[in-house]
UniProtKB/Swiss-Prot annotation:
Full protein name: UBX domain-containing protein 2B
Region listing for Disordered, in residue ranges: 1-97
InterPro entries: NSFL1C_SEP_dom_sf, SEP_domain, Ubiquitin-like_domsf, UBX_dom
Domain SEP span(s) in chain numbering: 175-240
CDD domains per the UniProt record, alphabetical: UBX_UBXN2B (cd17161)
């Protein structure tokens, strides 16, 4: 057309490119009547729909943006471990940290846990990964595990003549056997004191055990040998301090310095002494010095009785028969312990026989 207007075909192409909303508007314009409110709403709705379709087409194209919280990503640095969706309770329960100087090298560090069972479980798990085996398996593979080991330490080689002196022979390096007991409230070594899981020094000790290394605390015990560490799981129990196995000497001794040493015996309980006295009453003269005689009978029992030093050996025999009537028809003798001497002359007093405060043995003939 002369006025430069577009042809009908060109107008149709523009309408298809602009969308149905524009076509609807031009149709109303060509009809000669103004568009109604409904027509405007339909045109706007179709316009928004077209915009949404274009946005969806753009989102389908690949991008180089990484998802920050994708579960499939590999932890490469300390920063990627900070997960905002992790609750505070999880952090308090068991913390893990990653420390590294590059994307391909680093060290994972376990923080202190408030759950002892998890500490024990992780300790057994990682120790097993470093070569530790359960005790039943170790006992099956090692036939000498339960056998007692003979002494193999150092000792003295005695001289074979008066000119040659004794010399000390050093033994081979000995292995150190240590038992690590894991309790609910801590751990202990052998029968030692309780050590808390929360102590940083103790945590470092357990970390060394996890890695299969000798802890610093145990390195001083190793002199060229190795440490055999056994672990026992007692996480269901609270630590109880073990009783001391040391027992003081409670036997008898001999006072040296005379031909017939005086026996220094341990004090007996009052009940034991009273029982011996009640078995056979012995008349005691308080104006005369007294002594106490311990009698070891042939049946393994013993009697303890006070006598005057003027009592005779025959009085001891009578006391035995009165206390144990079964020996009345038995032939026996009385013998000293050191030196071993039979008391044949029973008419001697206890002082004359030099058996004050001693032990007398009954021997059957």
């Amino acid at each position: 057309m002369a006025d430069g207007g577009a042809s009908p075909a060109q107008q149709e192409g523009e309408m298809s490119a602009a969308g149905p909303g524009l076509r609807r508007e031009r149709q109303h314009r060509g009809s000669g009547r103004p568009p109604s409110a409904r027509d405007l709403q339909l045109a706007l709705a179709e316009l928004y729909e077209d915009e949404a379709k274009r946005q969806s087409l753009r989102s389908d194209k690949p991008t180089t943006t990484k998802m920050s919280n994708s579960k499939g990503l590999k932890i490469d640095s300390f920063r990627s471990l900070r997960k905002p969706e992790r609750s505070m309770s999880d952090d308090k329960e068991n913390q893990r940290f990653y420390s590294g100087d590059s994307e391909y090298r680093g060290l994972q560090i376990w923080g202190a846990s408030n759950n002892p069972s998890k500490i024990v479980a992780e300790l057994f798990k990682e120790a097993k990964e470093h070569g530790a085996v359960p005790l039943d398996e170790a006992s099956r593979t090692s036939g000498d595990f339960s056998k007692a080991k003979s002494f193999s330490g150092g000792g003295y080689r005695l001289g074979d003549s008066s000119q040659k002196h004794s010399e000390y022979i050093y033994g081979e390096n000995q292995d150190v056997q240590i038992l690590l007991k894991l309790w609910r409230n801590g751990f202990s070594l052998d029968d030692g004191e309780l050590r808390s899981y929360s102590d940083p020094i103790n945590a470092q000790f357990l970390e060394s055990v996890k890695r299969g290394e000798i802890p610093v605390d145990l390195q001083r015990l190793v002199h060229g040998g190795q440490v055999n560490l056994d672990m026992e799981d007692h996480q269901e129990q609270e630590y109880v301090k073990p009783r001391l196995r040391f027992k003081a000497f409670s036997g008898e001794g001999q006072k040296l310095g005379s031909l017939t040493p005086e026996i220094v015996s341990t004090p007996s309980s009052p009940e034991e002494e009273d029982k011996s006295i009640l078995n056979a009453p012995v008349l005691i003269d308080d104006s005369v010095p007294a002594t106490k005689i311990q009698i070891r009978l042939a049946d393994g029992s013993r009697l303890i009785q006070r006598f005057n030093q003027t009592h005779r050996i025959k009085d001891i025999r009578d006391f035995i028969i009165q206390s144990r009537p079964a020996f009345a028809t038995t032939d026996f003798v009385l013998v000293t312990t050191f030196p071993n001497k039979e008391l044949t002359d029973e008419s001697l007093t206890l002082r004359e026989a030099d058996i004050l405060n001693t032990v007398i043995l009954q021997q059957l003939k």
